[in-house]
Every structure is written in C-alpha cells, then in structure tokens.
C-alpha cells in the first residue's frame, strides 16, 4: 500500500513543467507583444506607431515605505511567496532590449544613437524630428521606455513599468479568464 502511494505521489505532470527559476527575455517579449498590442482594453500605449526605446536608461526605483521594503511591496503585489524568485528578477535587471518587438510591428528606436549626439534635455526635439520623418507628427516628442517586466511564478501577475522622458507609470497586470487586466500601482515624475 505504501509503495503505491509513493509511486502515485512521485508521478510528474510533464505538460506543466516550467523553469520557475528563470523568466527568459523571449518570454518577456511575448508578454509585451500581447499586452502592448491591446490598444482597446488595456491601452498601455496609444498605438504600435509610438516610438519605443530599445533600452530604458532609467533605473527601476520603487518607493520604499518606512519599515516596508521594495521587495515586500513586490511580494505582496505579485502575491508571490517565493521571495528568491522575485528578488532574482530585480537583482539581475539590466538594460532590457526591446529590439525584438520590431518583429511584431512596433517602432523600436536605438536611443544610443540619440544619446551620443545630444544632451539628455534635447532628446524630445530629436524624437519629434523622428516622429515627423516616420509620418507620425501627432506623437510630437512622445516615446516610451519599458523596464523588464517582473513576473510571479504562475505568470498570472506581472509588474510593468512604462517610462516617458520625465515620468513613468507602474502597472500590475493580472490575467483573469485568459485576459489581462491592469491596475495602476505607482507613478513618478521629474
């Protein structure tokens, strides 16, 4: 009887194996394509025609509350008990390359080119020129930068930061009934 119990409890469901210790760049790109393409319900961006920087040069910086760490805030938001899983995503944040989003019709621009030519405060003028030359004058000097999304292990809650030149918004995206829902959980402004 005991042998049968051990055998049954050790049986794996191979169809559900996910490497929980790693959120790949490809997984992030697929997620971003899905949520950014939804310009009807989520409306994270106005259109695929808005310029997206290939790299966010702002640092991830959550607000720390007294006696409440950034990590505690994230664990609670993501409803994640595996603190190492979340902490590893934060600790390994680097300049997340969004270049592959170009394959899905997004306007990705190499901001290193702009930063090498002009001062930080002159970036909006350069972006306006690019938007005009791309046939998108309605966007003026608008562009966005995306931080690498931070997932919970189930991949049904994600913290996504969308940065603009002098401001940014943090969204908690939750997957319910195969659809993503957004909730604004933070913002910053210079």
Segments from the language model and where they lie:
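Sec-dependent signal peptide recognition
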Residues: 1-2
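C-terminal motif of bacterial Sec signal peptides marking the signal peptidase cleavage site
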Residues: 6-9
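Flexible low-complexity loop/turn motifs enriched in small/helix-breaking residues
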Residues: 11-157
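Exposed beta-sheet edge and beta->alpha loop/turn motif
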Residues: 151-177
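Short beta-strand edge/turn micro-motifs at domain boundaries
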Residues: 170-190
């Amino acid at each position: 009887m005991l042998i049968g119990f051990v055998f049954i409890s050790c049986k794996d469901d191979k169809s559900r194996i996910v490497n929980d210790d790693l959120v790949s760049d490809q997984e992030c790109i697929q997620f971003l394509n899905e949520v950014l393409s939804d310009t009807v319900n989520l409306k994270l961006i106005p259109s695929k025609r808005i310029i997206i920087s290939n790299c966010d040069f702002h640092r991830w910086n959550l607000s720390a509350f007294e006696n409440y760490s950034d990590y505690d805030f994230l664990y609670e938001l993501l409803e994640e008990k595996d603190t190492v899983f979340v902490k590893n995503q934060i600790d390994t944040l680097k300049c997340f390359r969004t270049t592959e989003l170009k394959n899905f019709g997004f306007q990705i621009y190499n901001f290193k080119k702009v930063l090498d030519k002009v001062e930080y405060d002159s970036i909006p003028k350069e972006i306006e020129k690019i938007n005009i030359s791309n046939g998108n004058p309605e966007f003026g000097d608008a562009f966005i930068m995306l931080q690498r999304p931070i997932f919970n292990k189930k991949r049904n809650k994600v913290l996504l930061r969308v940065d603009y030149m002098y401001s940014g918004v943090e969204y908690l995206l939750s997957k319910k009934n195969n659809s993503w829902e957004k909730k604004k959980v933070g913002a910053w402004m210079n």
